[in-house]
Swiss-Prot record:
Annotated function: Binds to muscle nicotinic acetylcholine receptor (nAChR) and inhibit acetylcholine from binding to the receptor, thereby impairing neuromuscular transmission.
Protein biosynthesis is among the record's keywords: no
Protein name: Short neurotoxin 3FTx-Oxy4
Organism encoding this protein: Oxyuranus microlepidotus (Inland taipan)
Tissue-wise expression: Expressed by the venom gland.
Organism classification: Eukaryota, Metazoa, Chordata, Craniata, Vertebrata
Keyword Disulfide bond: yes
InterPro entries for this protein: Snake_3FTx, Snake_toxin-like_sf, Snake_toxin_con_site, Toxin_cobra-type
Residues making up the signal peptide according to the UniProt record: 1-21
Family listed: Belongs to the three-finger toxin family. Short-chain subfamily. Type I alpha-neurotoxin sub-subfamily.
Keywords: Acetylcholine receptor inhibiting toxin, Disulfide bond, Ion channel impairing toxin, Neurotoxin, Postsynaptic neurotoxin, Secreted, Signal, Toxin
Chief place where the protein resides: secreted
GO MF annotations in UniProt: acetylcholine receptor inhibitor activity; ion channel regulator activity; toxin activity
GO cellular component: a single term: extracellular region
Amino acid sequence: MKTLLLTLVVVTIVCLDLGYTMTCYNQQSSEAKTTTTCSGGVSSCYKETWYDGRGTRIERGCGCPRAKKGIERICCGTDKCNN
């Protein structure tokens, strides 16, 4: 009986994927690729693109912040989807 209960607990944890954390790219513009592990139950990544006097600027990170005027924002929901 204990073995069956333990098996059910393990299967539940595996199926629910408890403790899953999202991984997103967080490099800016043309920097080398780096990633970050998102905290606080964040389940999305973002990529923002805009233009200034220096050319195209890109920012990446966790979450899905509100885009300001003139900024193109893409949000996605899988690991490293904001490349």
